[in-house]
Amino acid sequence: MSTGMTAQAGVDTFGRVGVAMVTPFDQDGALDVSAGRRLAAHLVDNGVDSLILAGTTGESPTTSLDEKLELFAAVKEEVGGRAKLCAGAGTNNTATSIEAARAFADAGADSLLVVTPYYSKPSQAGVYAHFTAVADAVDLPVCLYDIPGRSGIPIETETLLRLAEVPNIKAVKDAKGDLVAAAPLIQETGLAWYSGDDGLNLPWLALGASGVISVIGHIAPRALADLYVAFDEGDIARAREINAKTLSPLVEAQGRLGGVTLVKAALRLQGIEVGEPRLPVTAADAEEIEALRHDLEKAGVL
């Protein structure tokens, strides 16, 4: 329960401490549903109150819709009563995104994450039409995912202001990193705002974000939850300490390895097996694993 330092918009739908969960594979590269159940339970047991499935960190480009739905169903059965479940439905194909959105709605998702269409670089008119088509196709809250470093284009301010008027568009996951531009939009739109960049979690909370959607939270879920609680209770010194001592070394490691490679290697070092990434994403090599071991020890999570 919040005590008031953090924004409350959207938390009943999207949660506060979210992790964009990896998709576990077995040694043959097939979906490992049992490992998915175990990982989801581990994260929720350690303070995570929202899981984002089938997102970029879930290797959405290299998993089929059937695989996504199978993992979602298993995770919902495992932790659905204890955490919010947000499903990644966005692609660079509007029709495919609508198909996924409807399938996840039928599967019982609490909300959807829809990324800016990537690679094809549509106009802002196309971005608006894409998001509204997906949102109109389902009766679920939608979180827009603004990540121009991957999509190639941003959601521009005027487009976002128009999208905020769509009834079931309720939130933004911001991985653009432009805090100055976002600060007035958080107030003006009334949308729930979520940090999509672990290195900026504290600044986003200070600007009025409702929570975080994290990658490194896989590796240090309790620390991430503790950071949120400390900030919410007004113990900024404690939040800074957690961020500096535990989370910052993991952010640095992510910068070297990338999210999926980092998480899967780190979880293995922690004794949680989730397999290796699917190509074209590669597993960490021996040298990278040794450096990562040092990072985890420095962070106090190994």
From Swiss-Prot:
| UniProt keyword annotation of Amino-acid biosynthesis present | yes
PROSITE patterns, from UniProt? Answer: DHDPS_1, DHDPS_2
EC code(s) of this entry: 4.3.3.7
Sorted alphabetically, the keyword list is: Amino-acid biosynthesis, Cytoplasm, Diaminopimelate biosynthesis, Lyase, Lysine biosynthesis, Schiff base
- Residues that hold pyruvate according to the record: 57, 213
Tell me the pathway: Amino-acid biosynthesis; L-lysine biosynthesis via DAP pathway; (S)-tetrahydrodipicolinate from L-aspartate: step 3/4
The active site is formed by 145 (proton donor/acceptor), 173 (schiff-base intermediate with substrate)
Which InterPro entries did the record assign? Answer: Aldolase_TIM, DapA, DapA-like, Schiff_base-form_aldolases_AS, Schiff_base-form_aldolases_CS
Purpose of the protein:
Catalyzes the condensation of (S)-aspartate-beta-semialdehyde [(S)-ASA] and pyruvate to 4-hydroxy-tetrahydrodipicolinate (HTPA).
Query: What family is this?
Result: Belongs to the DapA family.
Name recorded for this polypeptide: 4-hydroxy-tetrahydrodipicolinate synthase
**Organism name:** Corynebacterium aurimucosum (strain ATCC 700975 / DSM 44827 / CIP 107346 / CN-1)
